[in-house]
Amino acid sequence: MNLVSLESFLDNTAFLVLLLTMFAYWVAVVFPKPWLVQGASGAMAIANLTITALLGARWLEAGYFPISNLYESLFFLAWGITAVHFIAERMSQSRFVGAVTSPIALGIVAFAALTLPVDMQQSAPLVPALKSNWLMMHVSVMMVSYATLMVGSLLAIAFLFVTRGQAVELRGSSVGTGGFRQGLVKGNNLNPVGNLNPALEGVSGNSGNVAVLEKTTSTPAITLSPQRLTLADTLDNISYRIIGLGFPLLTIGIIAGAVWANEAWGSYWSWDPKETWALITWLVFAAYLHARITKGWQGRKPAILAASGFTVVWICYLGVNLLGKGLHSYGWFL
């Protein structure tokens, strides 16, 4: 079997394994049997190894890191998602992570293996602009950051689904253990009630007498079952942590790209569509992390912001290339 035939076998195998993985996780959500969850996790590991073997075979065939066209980048993205999946699953110990990540990985592999024309699946010599060591350093880091941010955003979307898009009061902290919530800390005073429930607050003057009564208002939170509340709390926390992992990767990838651009084109930043949307992506997730860390946001509001980030990542990765304009248009995906 030559390498081309092996690659064809491996991409079809990856599709079939991910299809089984998705169904296994979905069944495990309904019937939470330990052996079923372990089987689904094992199938995801097989899918990741299959994609790894595919990328390795392509590397041997082409002689360069396999991330030079849409087909290769899609499989690299799927590899990144399946790899980040295990980080999220280990952190959460929840079968719901796989129920969210397996469909997107399956969709990406299906698009690459079954939808792309044959000529777009074949390897080709690198264009001169890509013959650089920066290809691996910049593009691979960007793709891993996309995969990580997608997984974090998907978990945020799952949170919105579990909570039906309503405001819920979570028990965890937006910044992990030792964090604070919005409304609990103001200056040096602790307010155990905060703005969780309507209450009457006394405002004292200098004489010590109560001067006025003010009624504080808040949006009432819906009540979830203990199981759904625990799941929502887990999804919110893990989504935040995964996005916190992907954001520095995105930052490093953008900086590496700027250095490469200066070497190749004599300018660190050219404001072409890909660079502009990479900056927009960075700003969206910077706003997300800023809101969670400094404002104490939890639950619905940051989840909506992360969900919008999922769309922005796809536009940055794939959407702007449909324009066929800019310095990145030669790779159709870069």
UniProtKB/Swiss-Prot annotation:
One Pfam family here: Cytochrom_C_asm
Secretion signal, residue range per the UniProt entry: none
Cellular location(s): Cellular thylakoid membrane
Major location category of this protein: membrane
Mode of membrane association: Multi-pass membrane protein
GO biological process: cytochrome complex assembly
InterPro entries reported for this sequence: Cyt_c_assembly, Cyt_c_biogenesis_CcsA, Cyt_c_biogenesis_CcsA/CcmC
Induction pattern: By light.
Keywords: Cytochrome c-type biogenesis, Membrane, Thylakoid, Transmembrane, Transmembrane helix
GO molecular function: heme binding
GO cellular component, one term: plasma membrane-derived thylakoid membrane
Family annotation (PANTHER family): CYTOCHROME B_B6 PROTEIN-RELATED, HEME EXPORTER PROTEIN C
Similarity field: Belongs to the CcmF/CycK/Ccl1/NrfE/CcsA family.
Subunit and interaction comment: May interact with ccs1.
Protein known as: Cytochrome c biogenesis protein CcsA
Species of the source: Synechocystis sp. (strain ATCC 27184 / PCC 6803 / Kazusa)
